């Protein structure tokens, strides 16, 4: 892996009307002609993502969206997709054209961004084309956000916009470390990574790579082994490991092998702590014990993938949950952005580790569940509860 994963980058979305210059602004910030620019209104349809480095801030994702004023049946669908972008937005740029005098839509969208607690920078574009009557101070008085005046086409004041992005970016868009606060230099940490058919050929899955890198950055003695070789690894060590991190699917096997005084957790639980609210997810996992046949359960995955035999979300978890409930549950499985607005009626929501989501996107889903009083947990905490070891695998983390 040579690049920072998209999920770990600050997500900056640009919202504005058609032909306000959103795509031109993307090109100006990135210094490349990567977004299609046209005088025809509605050139951008689906959201467009561009990863880049914005120094000194670091790796970011710029998101170009469809116009706020898109019309017709297709336009409504485009606006719906644009609103879905807000679920993953860490910082919003609300774009105004210096040629415009109607700001009613911008007020509506600012209200929604504010309600979602997304920091906003107002950008007035096309200042090179503005008439002598244009007064930016009037616009700035209407909107209580910081403003920058630019010409995306002529690349005017783009440096000032980058400075504003640096200044107003949220400091807490992600935790500084996944596991570094749990270990110290020279600690022995064993990663148990069973290589099944779901793993990409010749590669580890993303959470394993990220956690291994974090352990190396924190000067630990990181050892990676398959579950079938764990006992051999333990017997070869001169002292007990300080921490064992395993794939949740082999919790039962690893728990049986490890001495009780060796701390144990999983990749999924660490990612839940890194991106979400682990205490909420642990509380949600306890609900598994009260599920009854016929109860509605939602299983949500962050990414869409071709499910193979033994898929954790589509086969194993439903089977284990049905066994625990003593009969068939009413289980619905969704993937990608297909997460219901209305969760009422569900007894429990189970979410994957969300390695392909940024923190904002996962937190948005947790908040949605909390606002509707629906318990939510993730795969790792759920599997730990099903195996009766949830307290053990979270005791160092809460």
Language-model-derived ranges and their functions:
Residues 12, 189, 295-297:
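Conserved hydrophobic helix-helix packing surfaces used for dimerization/oligomerization
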Residues 118-121, 126-181, 190, 219-222, ...:
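Canonical P-loop GTPase G-domain recognition
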């Amino acid at each position: 892996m040579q690049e920072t994963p998209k999920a770990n980058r600050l997500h900056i979305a640009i919202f504005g009307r058609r032909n306000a210059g959103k795509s031109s602004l993307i090109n100006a910030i990135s210094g490349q002609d990567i977004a299609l620019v046209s005088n025809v209104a509605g050139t951008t349809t689906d959201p467009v993502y561009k990863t880049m480095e914005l120094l000194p801030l670091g790796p970011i994702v710029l998101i170009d969206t469809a116009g706020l004023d898109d019309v017709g049946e297709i336009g409504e669908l485009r606006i719906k997709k644009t609103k879905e972008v807000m679920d993953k937005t860490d910082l919003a740029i609300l774009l105004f054209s210096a040629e415009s005098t109607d700001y009613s839509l911008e007020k509506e969208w600012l209200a929604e961004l504010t309600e979602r607690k997304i920091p906003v920078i107002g950008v007035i574009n096309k200042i090179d084309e503005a008439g002598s009557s244009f007064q930016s101070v009037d616009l700035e008085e209407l909107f209580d956000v910081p403003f920058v005046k630019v010409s995306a086409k002529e690349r005017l004041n783009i440096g000032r916009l980058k400075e504003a992005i640096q200044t107003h970016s949220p400091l807490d868009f992600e935790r500084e470390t996944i596991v570094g606060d749990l270990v110290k230099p020279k600690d022995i940490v064993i990663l148990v990574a069973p290589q099944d058919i779901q793993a990409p050929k010749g590669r580890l899955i993303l959470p394993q790579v990220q956690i291994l890198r974090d352990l190396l950055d924190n000067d630990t003695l990181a050892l990676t082994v398959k579950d079938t070789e764990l006992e051999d690894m333990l017997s070869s060590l001169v002292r007990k490991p300080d921490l064992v991190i395993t794939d949740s699917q082999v919790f039962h096997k690893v728990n049986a092998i490890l001495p009780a005084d060796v701390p144990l957790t999983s990749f999924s639980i660490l990612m839940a702590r890194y991106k979400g609210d682990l205490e909420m997810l642990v509380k949600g996992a306890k609900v598994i014990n009260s599920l009854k046949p016929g109860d509605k359960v939602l299983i949500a995955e962050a990414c869409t993938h071709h499910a193979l035999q033994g898929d954790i979300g589509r086969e194993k978890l439903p089977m284990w949950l049905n066994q625990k409930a003593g009969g068939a549950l009413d289980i619905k499985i969704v993937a990608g952005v297909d997460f219901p607005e209305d969760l009422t009626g569900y007894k429990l929501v189970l979410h994957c580790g969300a390695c392909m989501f940024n923190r904002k996107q996962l937190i948005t889903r947790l908040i949605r569940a909390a606002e509707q009083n629906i318990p939510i947990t993730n795969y790792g905490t759920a599997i730990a509860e099903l195996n009766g070891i949830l307290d053990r695998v979270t005791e160092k983390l809460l």
